[in-house]
Each structure stands twice: as structure tokens, then as C-alpha cells.
Amino acid sequence: MLRLCIALSALTAVSWAQSCGIPASEAKDFLAVHNKLRASISAGTYVAKGRKMPAAKTPIQPMTWDCAIEKSAQAVANTCVFAHSQGRQNLGENLYTMWSSNKVSFTGMGKKASDSWEKEFQDFGWSDVKLTPTGFSSGIGHATQMAWAKSTKLGCGMKLCDGDKKVLVVCQYRDA
């Protein structure tokens, strides 16, 4: 029953995504993918590399959108530099970029970026619900940021760069 409540609260959190700058639909997409992943790991229903992964030892709460974190992430995205920012003050961070020979837009970027980070679990799985340096360096660093149980606040920024032929997405995470 508790797992059902967590899954329902994850879906509810999506409807409360209030963006401060990026399109609200993209903020909702970021939260939807993050919270779906978190709910399935919490419930023990997540499948990676063809096997059902163990449930989290404690319930994983859904993430909520944070406008101050969005503002911080947007400042990083505005640099158009694909590199982790310095001085994040206890914020986790994920980066995503996409190039094209044609102009790109923000449409669908919340889902595309989040899906690409979550795919690390699909590609590499994990051996233990407790993150170790070995586990982190196995290629799941972005996905673990999405699933980190103590992180409950999310904010993302996006910037079109290089004549609108590249988009840089930055998401930052804060512990409760």
C-alpha cells in the first residue's frame, strides 16, 4: 500500500511543476521521467539489463520543482559550455547536449535529456542499492543523480547555442 501511495504521489508531483523560466511543459517532462524512475525503484518494479532490480530500502519520495535551483541551472546553461559548474554549493548536476545541422528547439528536451540519463541504468544496471565509488564509475552517474533518495528538489535550465543548432540542458539537484 505504501508503494502505491508513493507512485501516486509521484504522479501528483508532476502536475504541480511550476517553471520559473523554461517552458512549463518541459519542467513537467523533467519531473515525470525523474519521478517515474524513482517510484519504480522504490516499489521494486524497475527492470534493468533484463532483470528486476531490488526495491529501495526506504521509500523514495518524488521530486518537486524548485525555482531557485532552476535559476542556478539556467545560469550554467547560459554559458553554452558543456562542463560541470564550479561552486554549486551542495547541488548535484547532470548535463545533456544535442547538436543538429538544422536549428533545434526546446520541445521535448525535458524528456530526451532525462531519458538519456535514465538509460544508463538500462545499459549498465547496478549491483547494490548503496552507491559505491565502483558503482558510480561504472557509467551510471547521471542515473544515480535522478534516483538519489535524499534529493527531492529539481531545477533545470536550457539554452540554444551555436546559432540554435545546439541545445545545452543542465539539471541540478538538492537534498531535502
Provide a role label for each language-model segment.
Residues 1-10:
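Classical eukaryotic N-terminal signal peptides for Sec-dependent ER targeting/secretion
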Residues 3, 14-176:
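Mature extracellular or exoplasmic CAP/SCP-family domains and secreted bioactive peptides
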